């Protein structure tokens, strides 16, 4: 799996680059993880309802093709896009979501944070507060989009939406939980957990 550290990049061109990568990939194209950070932007998934944006702000809103509802991206949030061919694995998208969640939970545990998933609401939570979101798109058995983990970002813009379509859902970040770490440091811990949790079945890797 190739790891690409792209730094601070605008959302829309990155999304279109993911689409292009997925459209042109072949059976030989290596899977990739794109590690990014975005300037402030709201993204509205395929199931998203505009009324979940509670007030107009200067933050742009992009209607995108991932699953899910509305969320916010901004500086201080670690975003990982997963461009993977599911035909190389023995699991489907639901299991993939659980594996991604567990990789995030494993990463937070490295920092002494106890987190959990929720079978009824994808993402990762600390208590009742959401710390990470997931949203994927599957096309021709290939995935794109991915996860976002709140590290040190300004959480105020979440107050102007119903995060992931849930009114009153509270969010949190690693700095509020006593962790002072850069995005690069958190990515360094998260990537190995993702690689482990998303690994091919053992019988395939031995071939």
Curated annotation (Swiss-Prot):
<protein>
    <recommendedName>
        <fullName>Octanoyltransferase</fullName>
        <ecNumber>2.3.1.181</ecNumber>
    </recommendedName>
</protein>
<dbReference type="GO" id="GO:0005737">
    <property type="term" value="C:cytoplasm"/>
</dbReference>
<dbReference type="InterPro" id="IPR020605">
    <property type="entry name" value="Octanoyltransferase_CS"/>
</dbReference>
<comment type="pathway">
    <text>Protein modification; protein lipoylation via endogenous pathway; protein N(6)-(lipoyl)lysine from octanoyl-[acyl-carrier-protein]: step 1/2.</text>
</comment>
<dbReference type="InterPro" id="IPR000544">
    <property type="entry name" value="Octanoyltransferase"/>
</dbReference>
<comment type="similarity">
    <text>Belongs to the LipB family.</text>
</comment>
<keyword id="KW-0808">Transferase</keyword>
<dbReference type="Pfam" id="PF21948">
    <property type="entry name" value="LplA-B_cat"/>
</dbReference>
<feature type="binding site">
    <location>
        <begin position="66"/>
        <end position="73"/>
    </location>
    <ligand>
        <name>substrate</name>
    </ligand>
</feature>
<dbReference type="GO" id="GO:0036211">
    <property type="term" value="P:protein modification process"/>
</dbReference>
<dbReference type="InterPro" id="IPR045864">
    <property type="entry name" value="aa-tRNA-synth_II/BPL/LPL"/>
</dbReference>
<keyword id="KW-0012">Acyltransferase</keyword>
<feature type="binding site">
    <location>
        <begin position="146"/>
        <end position="148"/>
    </location>
    <ligand>
        <name>substrate</name>
    </ligand>
</feature>
<feature type="active site" description="Acyl-thioester intermediate">
    <location>
        <position position="164"/>
    </location>
</feature>
<feature type="site" description="Lowers pKa of active site Cys">
    <location>
        <position position="130"/>
    </location>
</feature>
<feature type="domain" description="BPL/LPL catalytic">
    <location>
        <begin position="27"/>
        <end position="202"/>
    </location>
</feature>
<dbReference type="GO" id="GO:0033819">
    <property type="term" value="F:lipoyl(octanoyl) transferase activity"/>
</dbReference>
<comment type="function">
    <text>Catalyzes the transfer of endogenously produced octanoic acid from octanoyl-acyl-carrier-protein onto the lipoyl domains of lipoate-dependent enzymes. Lipoyl-ACP can also act as a substrate although octanoyl-ACP is likely to be the physiological substrate.</text>
</comment>
<dbReference type="InterPro" id="IPR004143">
    <property type="entry name" value="BPL_LPL_catalytic"/>
</dbReference>
<keyword id="KW-0963">Cytoplasm</keyword>
<feature type="binding site">
    <location>
        <begin position="133"/>
        <end position="135"/>
    </location>
    <ligand>
        <name>substrate</name>
    </ligand>
</feature>
């Amino acid at each position: 799996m190739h790891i690409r550290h792209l730094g601070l990049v605008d959302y829309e061109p990155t999304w279109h680059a993911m689409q292009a990568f997925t459209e042109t990939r072949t059976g030989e194209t290596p899977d990739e993880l794109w590690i990014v950070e975005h300037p402030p932007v709201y993204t509205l998934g395929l199931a998203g309802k505009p009324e979940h944006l509670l007030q107009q702000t200067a933050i742009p809103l992009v209607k995108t093709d991932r699953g899910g509802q509305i969320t916010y991206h901004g500086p201080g949030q670690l975003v990982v896009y997963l461009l993977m061919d599911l035909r190389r694995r023995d699991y489907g998208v639901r299991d993939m979501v659980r594996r991604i969640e567990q990789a995030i939970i494993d990463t937070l545990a490295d920092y002494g944070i106890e987190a959990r998933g929720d079978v009824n609401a994808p993402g990762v939570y600390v208590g009742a507060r959401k710390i990470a979101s997931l949203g994927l798109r599957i096309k021709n058995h290939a995935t794109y989009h991915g996860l976002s983990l709140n590290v040190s970002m300004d959480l105020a813009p979440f107050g102007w939406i119903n995060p992931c379509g849930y009114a009153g859902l509270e969010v949190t970040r690693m700095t509020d939980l006593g962790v002072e770490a850069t995005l690069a440091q958190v990515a360094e811990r998260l990537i190995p957990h993702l690689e482990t949790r998303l690994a091919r079945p053992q019988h395939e890797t031995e071939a």
